[in-house]
Amino acid sequence: MRVKTGVVRRRRHKKILKLARGFYSGRRKHFRKAKEQLERSMCYAFRDRKQKKRDFRRLWITRINAACKMNGVSYSRFIHALKLANIELDRKTLADMAMNDINAFNAVLASVKNKLK
């Protein structure tokens, strides 16, 4: 007896089409187009999860650099002075301080000023 793929195919298609919700036009409605677009989308999602970490680090460095420049210190010299002073604040915290609590950032900067040459 020949086995038909009715239930299996429907489940497989339903799974793909469920993941394709929110896509535009036929990429949402037609199985083959949805499958192709989903494959691309998953690749972009995988790549951009890695890229997001790099982007945020660049943003934090830019913000810290801007706050340092207001006090006449370069970013690289500030980070070097932090290492010499054994202050273990990460860039995310420093950037948040530079944006939201400039007085605290200036206090950290003042505490490492003597390490700068």
Curated annotation (Swiss-Prot):
Q: Which PROSITE patterns match?
A: RIBOSOMAL_L20 (PS00937)
Task: State the CDD domains in the record.
Answer: Ribosomal_L20 (cd07026)
Q: Please provide, in alphabetical order, the Gene Ontology terms of the cellular component aspect for this entry.
A: ribonucleoprotein complex; ribosome
Annotated GO biological process: ribosomal large subunit assembly; translation
Record InterPro entries:
Ribosomal_bL20, RIBOSOMAL_L20_CS, Ribosomal_protein_bL20_C
Keywords of this entry: Ribonucleoprotein, Ribosomal protein, RNA-binding, rRNA-binding
An example Gene Ontology molecular-function term = rRNA binding
Q: Which family does it belong to?
A: Belongs to the bacterial ribosomal protein bL20 family.
Give the protein's function: Binds directly to 23S ribosomal RNA and is necessary for the in vitro assembly process of the 50S ribosomal subunit. It is not involved in the protein synthesizing functions of that subunit.
> Which HAMAP family does this chain map to?
Ribosomal_bL20 (MF_00382)
Protein known as: Large ribosomal subunit protein bL20
This chain's source organism reads: Helicobacter hepaticus (strain ATCC 51449 / 3B1)
